[in-house]
Amino acid sequence: MLDIKYVRENPDAVKKMLEMRLLASESKKIDELIRYDSERKAKVTESDTLKAMRNSVTQEIAKIKREKTGSADELIAEMKIVSDRISEIDAELREIETKQEELLLAVPNILHESVPEGKSAADNVVYKEVMDCKREFDFKPKDHIELGKSLGMLDFERGAKIAGAGFPLYIGKGASLERALINFMLDLHLEKHGYKEVFPPFFVNRDSLRGTGQWPKFADQVYYMNDDDIYAIPTAEVPVTNMHRDEMLQSKELPIKYAAYSACFRREAGSYGKDTKGFLRVHQFNKVEMVKFVLPETSYDELEALLGDAEDVLKALEIPYRVLLLCSGDISANAAKCYDIEVWSPAEEKFLEASSCSNFEDYQARRAQIRFRRQPKAKPEFVHTLNGSGLATSRLMVSLMENYQTPDGKIQVPKVLQKYMGCEVIG
């Protein structure tokens, strides 16, 4: 979340950010937030003044009793009234702080100056295209659904029978290819890019969702287990970022870089009418996530490095892709800047999102209270957090299967995956 001090001192900048994010109607909440902040400060001042008075008079009462110079009954009665008023003020203060925090949690992140202004995905800027490995087919390429069925790799019908639509079932070489992708990506990030592996819980509590910004605003997108008051993770970003919630780090530890595999679960509420066939939109998918905790002054260099780490996966697999710089109307509420990586689907003849790489600056760290000290006795500061998909396997599987298909309906296994698969061709 934003620093209330920043909101108080820069209300116009915050309102401009809301306008750029197509949330101009929320501007009145900034005025309300500042009003609560003024009320809070006034209540704190009043409470502190009365507490100082009570402490002083309490000492006077003790002196009167000790020296037996008179009756302290009148002062005691007055302090009873003062104490009752302090209790009232403190209760009012807690209520104000709760309302202020609710409003502050809902305010999106300030956008980096390099984020282009725009209204929708159509206004995203193509940052780069890497299409030199694009294959030209002399036959009509099949889509991943047809390939998966004909080769006995995927069974969406049985997946739907087991759990419902949007829960794919991998079989045989399909399961092997999925596992190969996960292991390859983890090995690449650990051995080449210097990340530390984490295998996190697939369920988290509300504090964890709050820390990364999915709660309360996006709670309707997450699967919730009511009896246990616990949530299925939408991404490994949530448990991995919260590893350091409420912790004080030292600058010499930074950057901290984690790579984690997890299954991801998303309700995809509001996705009706969108392309939902096959892997294009599912409720459960697999992903390797990269998470960084870095010094504030290095976070944008670290973002470019994070993007490069994700791109290395596609370069090694020789899959065509492009990188988009997301505009103000399409970027997530938590991110200050974000790149999307899209892979090429020959059958669909379009790009499919396979990764997002984001810098949150101190937005998540402030919510999760992840701080560091530059020196042992230095003032604590908030770290900057970043994360990126490295990558999500569902759309990657689509692109891989379609790009590597042969005229006779088989799939060539990319060279970097052959040692994991134990074969060169599927089919």
Curated annotation (Swiss-Prot):
Q: Which SUPFAM superfamilies does the entry mention?
A: Class II aaRS and biotin synthetases, tRNA-binding arm
Molecular functions (GO terms): ATP binding; serine-tRNA ligase activity
**Gene Ontology cellular-component terms listed:** cytoplasm
Task: Please tell me whether the keyword Cytoplasm is annotated for this protein.
Answer: yes
Q: Where in the cell is it found?
A: Cytoplasm
- Subunit and partners: Homodimer. The tRNA molecule binds across the dimer.
Question: What job does the chain carry out?
Answer: Catalyzes the attachment of serine to tRNA(Ser). Is also able to aminoacylate tRNA(Sec) with serine, to form the misacylated tRNA L-seryl-tRNA(Sec), which will be further converted into selenocysteinyl-tRNA(Sec).
What's a GO biological-process term for it? Answer: selenocysteine biosynthetic process
The Enzyme Commission number assigned here is 6.1.1.11
Which family does the UniProt entry place this protein in?
A: Belongs to the class-II aminoacyl-tRNA synthetase family. Type-1 seryl-tRNA synthetase subfamily.
What pathway does the UniProt record associate with this protein? Aminoacyl-tRNA biosynthesis; selenocysteinyl-tRNA(Sec) biosynthesis; L-seryl-tRNA(Sec) from L-serine and tRNA(Sec): step 1/1
Q: Which CDD domains match?
A: SerRS_core (cd00770)
Q: Which residues bind L-serine?
A: 235-237, 289, 389
> Which top EC class is given?
ligase
Q: Which controlled-vocabulary keywords does the entry list?
A: Aminoacyl-tRNA synthetase, ATP-binding, Cytoplasm, Ligase, Nucleotide-binding, Protein biosynthesis
Which lineage?
Bacteria, Pseudomonadati, Chlorobiota, Chlorobiia, Chlorobiales
Q: Where does ATP bind?
A: 266-268, 282, 353-356
Q: What protein name applies here?
A: Serine--tRNA ligase
